[in-house]
A protein has these predicted regions:
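Active-site-proximal loop/helix of nucleotide/amide-processing enzymes and allied scaffolds
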Residues: 1-30, 38, 47-50, 72, ...
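Glycine-enriched loop-and-adjacent helix/strand subsegments that border the catalytic/binding cleft
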Residues: 31-74
Length: 172
């Protein structure tokens, strides 16, 4: 849950802390292994889906991950955050943003999960999660660039393309 008394000055301090931590941490995945990610630019939802969907699309359960990107949307890191059931996966707000705070050069994030049914249509829970993520991104001053849901046969749903990223200035 977000601390609603989080002030802009605390946000600025958080940004500085993130910069300091990033200067001293190697790039690692959620299992602690050093990550080697391809040099690719995630400049639009279609490209992001083409690059990230193969990492989770064929799973028999829902998998939720976060892509950390640079100012020019270069993929810096990919972190699988949770694996759930055929119908859902748990998502913790801190777990979504911690990898971004610890990945050097991160200036934005994209969250991605699959629908094992193959139908990328978002559920009401997916929409609520996106709004919560937009609010958390605002507090952290870290843009949430998109929430992608991937299905089968290269199908995907982009909350950005659908205009459903909420009223988040950081997410625009």
């Amino acid at each position: 849950m977000l601390n609603e008394s989080f002030s802009p000055s605390a946000s600025t301090r958080g940004h500085r802390v993130r910069e300091l931590v990033c200067a001293y941490r190697p790039l690692r995945d959620s299992d602690g292994r050093v990550v080697d990610v391809p040099t690719v630019m995630l400049t639009d939802p279609r490209t992001a889906a083409a690059v990230l969907a193969p990492l989770i699309a064929d799973q028999s359960v829902e998998v939720f991950g976060v892509a950390c990107v640079s100012t020019k949307h270069r993929l810096l890191a990919w972190h699988v955050l949770s694996r759930g059931t055929r119908a859902s996966t748990p998502v913790s707000m801190p777990d979504v943003f911690v990898p971004a705070c610890l990945t050097p050069g991160t200036t934005g994030v994209m969250v991605v999960h699959n629908h094992p049914s193959g139908d990328p249509t978002p559920s009401p829970d997916d929409a609520r999660l996106t709004l919560r993520l937009c609010a958390a991104a605002d507090v952290l001053d870290l843009p949430l660039l998109d929430h992608l849901i991937v299905g089968d046969e290269h199908r995907y749903f982009s909350f950005r393309e659908a205009g459903l990223m909420g009223a988040s200035p950081a997410g625009r």
